[in-house]
Swiss-Prot record:
Superkingdom of origin: Bacteria
Gene name tied to this protein: murD
Recorded catalytic activity of this chain's protein: UDP-N-acetyl-alpha-D-muramoyl-L-alanine + D-glutamate + ATP = UDP-N-acetyl-alpha-D-muramoyl-L-alanyl-D-glutamate + ADP + phosphate + H(+)
Tagged with keyword Phosphoprotein: no
Protein name: UDP-N-acetylmuramoylalanine--D-glutamate ligase
Natural source organism: Campylobacter jejuni (strain RM1221)
Keywords: ATP-binding, Cell cycle, Cell division, Cell shape, Cell wall biogenesis/degradation, Cytoplasm, Ligase, Nucleotide-binding, Peptidoglycan synthesis
EC numbers on record: 6.3.2.9
Length: 402
Protein backbone atom coordinates (compact mmCIF):
# COMPACT_ATOMS: atom_id res chain seq x y z
CA UNK A 1 0.00 0.00 0.00
CA UNK A 2 1.44 3.37 -1.01
CA UNK A 3 0.49 6.19 1.36
CA UNK A 4 1.05 9.80 0.36
CA UNK A 5 1.31 12.51 3.01
CA UNK A 6 0.47 16.11 2.12
CA UNK A 7 2.45 18.72 4.05
CA UNK A 8 5.44 18.17 6.31
CA UNK A 9 3.73 19.14 9.54
CA UNK A 10 3.44 17.66 13.00
CA UNK A 11 0.65 15.23 12.05
CA UNK A 12 2.23 13.82 8.90
CA UNK A 13 5.72 13.63 10.41
CA UNK A 14 4.30 11.60 13.31
CA UNK A 15 2.68 9.16 10.88
CA UNK A 16 5.88 8.80 8.86
CA UNK A 17 8.04 8.31 11.95
CA UNK A 18 5.79 5.93 13.89
CA UNK A 19 4.38 3.73 11.13
CA UNK A 20 7.39 3.21 8.87
CA UNK A 21 7.84 -0.35 10.18
CA UNK A 22 4.23 -1.23 9.36
CA UNK A 23 3.83 0.45 5.99
CA UNK A 24 7.38 0.95 4.77
CA UNK A 25 8.38 4.32 3.41
CA UNK A 26 5.92 7.15 2.77
CA UNK A 27 5.84 9.71 -0.01
CA UNK A 28 5.70 13.15 1.60
CA UNK A 29 4.77 16.15 -0.54
CA UNK A 30 5.40 19.73 0.51
CA UNK A 31 5.79 23.02 -1.35
CA UNK A 32 9.09 23.58 0.47
CA UNK A 33 10.66 20.51 -1.14
CA UNK A 34 12.32 21.72 -4.34
CA UNK A 35 14.07 18.48 -5.25
CA UNK A 36 13.46 14.85 -4.33
CA UNK A 37 15.30 13.65 -1.23
CA UNK A 38 15.02 10.97 1.42
CA UNK A 39 14.79 11.53 5.15
CA UNK A 40 16.63 9.39 7.70
CA UNK A 41 13.82 6.81 7.69
CA UNK A 42 13.82 6.38 3.95
CA UNK A 43 10.68 8.43 3.26
CA UNK A 44 10.67 10.30 -0.03
CA UNK A 45 10.39 14.09 0.26
CA UNK A 46 8.78 15.31 -2.94
CA UNK A 47 7.58 18.47 -4.62
CA UNK A 48 3.79 18.53 -5.23
CA UNK A 49 4.40 18.59 -8.98
CA UNK A 50 5.68 15.01 -8.68
CA UNK A 51 2.41 13.60 -7.30
CA UNK A 52 0.76 10.91 -9.44
CA UNK A 53 -2.66 9.94 -8.11
CA UNK A 54 -2.48 6.64 -10.00
CA UNK A 55 0.46 5.57 -7.84
CA UNK A 56 -1.13 6.45 -4.48
CA UNK A 57 -3.58 4.32 -2.47
CA UNK A 58 -4.27 6.76 0.38
CA UNK A 59 -3.62 10.48 0.75
CA UNK A 60 -3.47 12.04 4.24
CA UNK A 61 -3.16 15.84 4.53
CA UNK A 62 -1.83 17.83 7.44
CA UNK A 63 -4.99 19.23 9.11
CA UNK A 64 -4.45 22.80 7.93
CA UNK A 65 -3.49 21.86 4.37
CA UNK A 66 -5.40 24.25 2.05
CA UNK A 67 -8.42 22.59 0.39
CA UNK A 68 -7.76 24.46 -2.86
CA UNK A 69 -4.19 23.15 -3.13
CA UNK A 70 -3.52 21.21 -6.32
CA UNK A 71 -2.63 18.10 -4.30
CA UNK A 72 -6.09 18.05 -2.72
CA UNK A 73 -7.69 18.59 -6.10
CA UNK A 74 -5.77 15.65 -7.61
CA UNK A 75 -6.20 13.22 -4.70
CA UNK A 76 -8.51 10.25 -5.27
CA UNK A 77 -8.34 8.57 -1.84
CA UNK A 78 -8.18 11.48 0.59
CA UNK A 79 -8.74 10.88 4.30
CA UNK A 80 -7.91 12.62 7.56
CA UNK A 81 -5.68 11.19 10.27
CA UNK A 82 -8.92 10.54 12.22
CA UNK A 83 -10.19 8.32 9.40
CA UNK A 84 -6.81 6.63 9.03
CA UNK A 85 -6.67 5.62 12.70
CA UNK A 86 -10.41 5.07 13.20
CA UNK A 87 -10.21 1.28 13.07
CA UNK A 88 -7.87 1.23 16.09
CA UNK A 89 -9.33 4.27 17.87
CA UNK A 90 -10.72 3.45 21.33
CA UNK A 91 -13.77 5.19 22.75
CA UNK A 92 -13.34 8.89 22.01
CA UNK A 93 -14.53 12.35 22.93
CA UNK A 94 -14.08 15.06 20.33
CA UNK A 95 -14.11 18.69 21.43
CA UNK A 96 -14.54 21.50 18.92
CA UNK A 97 -15.80 25.07 18.62
CA UNK A 98 -14.12 28.38 17.87
CA UNK A 99 -12.68 29.23 21.29
CA UNK A 100 -11.97 27.13 24.35
CA UNK A 101 -11.20 23.84 22.59
CA UNK A 102 -7.75 23.45 24.11
CA UNK A 103 -8.77 24.43 27.63
CA UNK A 104 -11.84 22.17 27.60
CA UNK A 105 -9.79 19.26 26.26
CA UNK A 106 -7.16 19.77 28.94
CA UNK A 107 -9.75 20.11 31.71
CA UNK A 108 -11.64 17.00 30.59
CA UNK A 109 -8.41 15.00 30.48
CA UNK A 110 -7.53 16.31 33.93
CA UNK A 111 -10.87 15.00 35.20
CA UNK A 112 -10.68 11.64 33.43
CA UNK A 113 -7.01 10.66 33.36
CA UNK A 114 -7.58 8.33 36.32
CA UNK A 115 -9.72 6.09 34.10
CA UNK A 116 -7.14 5.97 31.33
CA UNK A 117 -8.01 9.05 29.29
CA UNK A 118 -5.28 10.56 27.11
CA UNK A 119 -5.31 13.82 25.18
CA UNK A 120 -4.39 14.45 21.57
CA UNK A 121 -5.45 15.79 18.22
CA UNK A 122 -5.05 19.52 17.66
CA UNK A 123 -3.40 19.88 21.06
CA UNK A 124 -0.35 18.01 22.25
CA UNK A 125 -0.04 14.56 20.72
CA UNK A 126 -0.80 13.53 17.11
CA UNK A 127 -2.99 10.44 16.79
CA UNK A 128 -0.04 8.44 15.43
CA UNK A 129 1.61 8.78 18.85
CA UNK A 130 -1.43 7.95 20.99
CA UNK A 131 -1.73 4.51 22.55
CA UNK A 132 -4.73 2.68 20.99
CA UNK A 133 -4.96 0.49 24.10
CA UNK A 134 -5.84 3.42 26.35
CA UNK A 135 -9.49 3.45 27.40
CA UNK A 136 -10.37 6.91 26.12
CA UNK A 137 -8.99 9.41 23.64
CA UNK A 138 -10.00 13.03 24.26
CA UNK A 139 -9.29 14.88 21.04
CA UNK A 140 -9.23 18.61 20.41
CA UNK A 141 -10.68 18.66 16.93
CA UNK A 142 -10.23 21.55 14.51
CA UNK A 143 -12.49 22.54 11.65
CA UNK A 144 -9.62 21.62 9.32
CA UNK A 145 -9.59 18.03 10.57
CA UNK A 146 -13.38 17.80 10.40
CA UNK A 147 -13.31 19.06 6.81
CA UNK A 148 -11.19 16.09 5.75
CA UNK A 149 -12.92 13.49 7.97
CA UNK A 150 -15.63 11.36 6.33
CA UNK A 151 -15.65 8.07 8.24
CA UNK A 152 -14.57 8.50 11.86
CA UNK A 153 -16.91 9.60 14.65
CA UNK A 154 -16.74 9.99 18.43
CA UNK A 155 -18.99 8.59 21.14
CA UNK A 156 -19.26 12.11 22.57
CA UNK A 157 -19.02 15.30 20.52
CA UNK A 158 -18.77 18.48 22.61
CA UNK A 159 -19.21 21.63 20.54
CA UNK A 160 -18.43 25.02 22.03
CA UNK A 161 -19.92 28.19 20.47
CA UNK A 162 -19.01 28.97 16.87
CA UNK A 163 -18.06 32.42 15.58
CA UNK A 164 -16.31 33.54 12.35
CA UNK A 165 -12.76 32.19 11.99
CA UNK A 166 -10.51 30.73 9.29
CA UNK A 167 -12.83 32.11 6.60
CA UNK A 168 -10.06 32.43 4.01
CA UNK A 169 -9.45 28.67 4.44
CA UNK A 170 -13.09 27.52 4.48
CA UNK A 171 -14.36 30.05 1.96
CA UNK A 172 -17.31 31.27 4.04
CA UNK A 173 -18.75 31.22 7.54
CA UNK A 174 -21.43 28.79 6.42
CA UNK A 175 -18.77 26.36 5.17
CA UNK A 176 -16.94 26.73 8.49
CA UNK A 177 -20.11 25.91 10.45
CA UNK A 178 -20.97 22.98 8.21
CA UNK A 179 -17.52 21.47 8.76
CA UNK A 180 -18.01 21.81 12.52
CA UNK A 181 -21.38 20.03 12.29
CA UNK A 182 -20.41 17.43 9.68
CA UNK A 183 -19.59 14.70 12.20
CA UNK A 184 -23.19 14.64 13.47
CA UNK A 185 -24.44 12.81 10.39
CA UNK A 186 -22.17 9.85 11.22
CA UNK A 187 -23.09 9.53 14.89
CA UNK A 188 -25.64 6.94 16.04
CA UNK A 189 -28.25 6.42 18.76
CA UNK A 190 -25.68 5.40 21.36
CA UNK A 191 -23.69 8.61 20.92
CA UNK A 192 -24.14 11.99 22.61
CA UNK A 193 -23.54 15.48 21.30
CA UNK A 194 -23.53 18.68 23.36
CA UNK A 195 -23.95 21.72 21.15
CA UNK A 196 -25.21 25.32 21.11
CA UNK A 197 -29.00 25.63 20.93
CA UNK A 198 -28.84 27.33 17.54
CA UNK A 199 -27.73 24.01 16.04
CA UNK A 200 -30.16 21.80 17.97
CA UNK A 201 -32.09 20.85 14.83
CA UNK A 202 -29.06 19.55 12.95
CA UNK A 203 -29.94 16.09 11.56
CA UNK A 204 -28.30 13.32 13.60
CA UNK A 205 -29.14 10.02 15.23
CA UNK A 206 -27.13 11.01 18.31
CA UNK A 207 -28.77 12.14 21.53
CA UNK A 208 -28.62 15.95 21.46
CA UNK A 209 -28.13 18.09 24.56
CA UNK A 210 -28.31 21.74 23.53
CA UNK A 211 -27.45 24.81 25.59
CA UNK A 212 -27.93 28.57 25.37
CA UNK A 213 -25.12 29.68 27.70
CA UNK A 214 -23.07 28.63 30.73
CA UNK A 215 -26.03 28.75 33.08
CA UNK A 216 -28.20 26.67 30.77
CA UNK A 217 -25.52 24.03 30.22
CA UNK A 218 -24.87 23.80 33.95
CA UNK A 219 -28.58 23.30 34.61
CA UNK A 220 -28.79 20.50 32.03
CA UNK A 221 -26.18 18.51 34.01
CA UNK A 222 -27.12 19.65 37.55
CA UNK A 223 -23.78 21.44 37.86
CA UNK A 224 -23.42 23.91 40.74
CA UNK A 225 -21.62 26.90 39.22
CA UNK A 226 -20.82 28.27 42.67
CA UNK A 227 -18.48 25.32 43.20
CA UNK A 228 -16.39 26.18 40.13
CA UNK A 229 -13.44 28.52 40.72
CA UNK A 230 -12.98 29.48 37.04
CA UNK A 231 -14.59 32.64 35.71
CA UNK A 232 -15.51 33.75 32.20
CA UNK A 233 -14.22 33.15 29.57
CA UNK A 234 -13.09 29.83 31.05
CA UNK A 235 -16.33 29.08 32.90
CA UNK A 236 -18.03 27.48 29.89
CA UNK A 237 -14.94 25.32 29.28
CA UNK A 238 -15.05 24.10 32.87
CA UNK A 239 -18.78 23.33 32.73
CA UNK A 240 -18.34 21.46 29.45
CA UNK A 241 -15.53 19.36 30.95
CA UNK A 242 -17.75 18.49 33.92
CA UNK A 243 -20.61 17.64 31.55
CA UNK A 244 -18.36 15.17 29.73
CA UNK A 245 -17.39 13.62 33.07
CA UNK A 246 -21.06 13.41 34.05
CA UNK A 247 -21.96 11.55 30.85
CA UNK A 248 -19.14 9.05 31.22
CA UNK A 249 -18.99 8.51 34.99
CA UNK A 250 -22.09 10.17 36.46
CA UNK A 251 -19.81 12.15 38.78
CA UNK A 252 -18.92 15.83 39.18
CA UNK A 253 -15.39 16.33 40.54
CA UNK A 254 -15.38 20.02 41.45
CA UNK A 255 -12.29 19.86 43.64
CA UNK A 256 -10.29 18.05 40.98
CA UNK A 257 -11.44 20.53 38.33
CA UNK A 258 -10.44 23.50 40.46
CA UNK A 259 -6.93 22.09 40.80
CA UNK A 260 -6.43 22.46 37.04
CA UNK A 261 -3.73 25.00 36.12
CA UNK A 262 -4.33 27.16 33.06
CA UNK A 263 -1.82 27.07 30.22
CA UNK A 264 0.21 30.07 29.13
CA UNK A 265 -0.87 32.48 26.38
CA UNK A 266 -4.53 32.69 27.42
CA UNK A 267 -5.27 35.73 29.58
CA UNK A 268 -1.88 35.23 31.23
CA UNK A 269 -1.37 38.13 33.63
CA UNK A 270 2.07 39.62 34.34
CA UNK A 271 3.28 42.76 36.09
CA UNK A 272 6.04 45.07 34.90
CA UNK A 273 8.67 46.79 37.05
CA UNK A 274 6.18 49.58 37.81
CA UNK A 275 3.54 47.09 39.02
CA UNK A 276 1.34 47.70 35.98
CA UNK A 277 -0.84 44.90 34.60
CA UNK A 278 -0.07 43.35 31.20
CA UNK A 279 -2.07 40.43 29.80
CA UNK A 280 -0.74 37.92 27.28
CA UNK A 281 -3.77 36.69 25.35
CA UNK A 282 -1.88 35.92 22.15
CA UNK A 283 -4.04 32.85 21.52
CA UNK A 284 -7.06 35.13 20.96
CA UNK A 285 -6.99 34.95 17.16
CA UNK A 286 -10.65 35.72 16.46
CA UNK A 287 -13.22 38.31 17.46
CA UNK A 288 -15.16 36.23 19.99
CA UNK A 289 -11.98 35.47 21.95
CA UNK A 290 -11.14 39.17 22.05
CA UNK A 291 -14.68 40.05 23.15
CA UNK A 292 -14.34 37.59 26.03
CA UNK A 293 -11.03 39.17 27.05
CA UNK A 294 -12.47 42.68 26.89
CA UNK A 295 -15.42 41.65 29.06
CA UNK A 296 -13.02 40.27 31.64
CA UNK A 297 -11.37 43.69 32.05
CA UNK A 298 -14.38 45.90 31.32
CA UNK A 299 -14.01 47.78 34.62
CA UNK A 300 -10.57 49.10 33.61
CA UNK A 301 -9.24 51.29 30.85
CA UNK A 302 -7.85 48.89 28.23
CA UNK A 303 -4.82 49.39 26.00
CA UNK A 304 -5.38 46.76 23.32
CA UNK A 305 -2.75 45.43 20.91
CA UNK A 306 -4.57 44.21 17.81
CA UNK A 307 -3.60 42.99 14.35
CA UNK A 308 -1.69 40.35 12.41
CA UNK A 309 -3.08 38.00 9.77
CA UNK A 310 -6.84 38.57 9.89
CA UNK A 311 -7.53 35.37 7.89
CA UNK A 312 -10.02 37.19 5.68
CA UNK A 313 -12.48 37.83 8.51
CA UNK A 314 -14.50 41.05 8.69
CA UNK A 315 -13.85 42.49 12.17
CA UNK A 316 -16.39 45.33 11.97
CA UNK A 317 -18.57 43.76 14.68
CA UNK A 318 -15.60 43.59 17.05
CA UNK A 319 -14.83 47.28 16.60
CA UNK A 320 -18.49 48.17 17.11
CA UNK A 321 -18.38 46.08 20.29
CA UNK A 322 -15.36 48.07 21.49
CA UNK A 323 -17.39 51.29 21.49
CA UNK A 324 -18.75 50.27 24.89
CA UNK A 325 -15.29 50.26 26.49
CA UNK A 326 -12.75 52.78 27.70
CA UNK A 327 -10.15 51.63 25.19
CA UNK A 328 -7.18 52.68 23.06
CA UNK A 329 -5.83 50.53 20.24
CA UNK A 330 -2.31 49.75 19.07
CA UNK A 331 -2.25 48.25 15.57
CA UNK A 332 0.40 45.74 14.51
CA UNK A 333 1.15 43.27 11.75
CA UNK A 334 0.27 42.98 8.10
CA UNK A 335 -3.24 44.23 8.86
CA UNK A 336 -2.07 47.45 10.57
CA UNK A 337 -3.72 49.79 8.05
CA UNK A 338 -6.91 47.74 8.07
CA UNK A 339 -7.06 47.91 11.89
CA UNK A 340 -6.55 51.68 11.76
CA UNK A 341 -9.37 51.97 9.22
CA UNK A 342 -11.70 49.91 11.43
CA UNK A 343 -10.80 52.12 14.39
CA UNK A 344 -11.44 55.32 12.44
CA UNK A 345 -14.89 54.14 11.33
CA UNK A 346 -15.73 53.21 14.94
CA UNK A 347 -14.33 56.51 16.24
CA UNK A 348 -11.78 54.72 18.43
CA UNK A 349 -8.34 56.13 19.22
CA UNK A 350 -5.61 54.03 17.62
CA UNK A 351 -1.83 54.14 17.25
CA UNK A 352 0.07 52.87 14.22
CA UNK A 353 2.75 50.57 15.63
CA UNK A 354 3.22 47.82 13.01
CA UNK A 355 5.51 45.71 15.22
CA UNK A 356 4.87 44.30 18.69
CA UNK A 357 7.88 45.86 20.41
CA UNK A 358 6.82 49.34 19.31
CA UNK A 359 3.27 48.69 20.55
CA UNK A 360 4.54 47.67 23.99
CA UNK A 361 6.76 50.75 24.21
CA UNK A 362 3.93 53.03 23.08
CA UNK A 363 1.57 51.56 25.66
CA UNK A 364 4.19 51.98 28.37
CA UNK A 365 4.11 55.73 27.71
CA UNK A 366 0.39 55.85 28.54
CA UNK A 367 -0.37 52.96 30.90
CA UNK A 368 -1.35 53.72 34.50
CA UNK A 369 -1.38 51.32 37.45
CA UNK A 370 -5.17 50.99 37.51
CA UNK A 371 -5.36 50.19 33.77
CA UNK A 372 -4.57 47.09 31.72
CA UNK A 373 -2.41 46.44 28.65
CA UNK A 374 -3.87 43.58 26.66
CA UNK A 375 -2.37 41.59 23.79
CA UNK A 376 -5.52 40.06 22.33
CA UNK A 377 -4.89 40.52 18.62
CA UNK A 378 -7.96 38.95 16.93
CA UNK A 379 -5.57 37.74 14.23
CA UNK A 380 -3.19 34.89 13.51
CA UNK A 381 0.52 35.44 14.09
CA UNK A 382 2.22 33.92 11.04
CA UNK A 383 2.71 37.25 9.26
CA UNK A 384 5.46 38.16 11.75
CA UNK A 385 5.99 35.13 14.02
CA UNK A 386 6.38 31.37 13.78
CA UNK A 387 3.40 30.80 16.08
CA UNK A 388 1.03 32.49 18.51
CA UNK A 389 3.26 31.13 21.29
CA UNK A 390 6.30 32.95 19.90
CA UNK A 391 4.24 36.14 19.71
CA UNK A 392 3.34 35.73 23.37
CA UNK A 393 6.97 35.04 24.28
CA UNK A 394 8.16 38.19 22.50
CA UNK A 395 5.40 40.19 24.19
CA UNK A 396 6.50 39.07 27.65
CA UNK A 397 10.15 39.73 26.82
CA UNK A 398 9.28 43.28 25.77
CA UNK A 399 7.29 43.86 28.96
CA UNK A 400 10.13 42.53 31.10
CA UNK A 401 12.50 45.08 29.54
CA UNK A 402 10.39 48.01 30.72
Amino acid sequence: MKISLFGYGKTTRAIAENLVDKFGSFDIYDDHFVETKKDTLGNLLLNPNDFDNNLSDIEIPSPGFPPKHKLIQKAKNLQSEYDFFYDIMPKSVWISGTNGKTTTTQMATHLLSHIGAVMGGNVGTPLAELNPYEKLWILETSSFTLHYTHKAKPEIYALLPISPDHLSWHGSFDNYVQDKLSVLKRMNECDVTILPKIYANTPTKAHIISYKDEKDLAAKFSIDMEKISFKSPFLLDAIMALAIEKILLDTLSYELLNSFVMEKNKLEEIKDSQNRLWVNDTKATNESAVMAALNRYKDKKIHLIIGGDDKGVDLSNLFDFMKGFDIELYAIGISTEKMLDYAKKANLKAYKCEVLSKAVNEISNHLRVNEVALLSPACASLDQFNSYAERGKVFKECVNKI
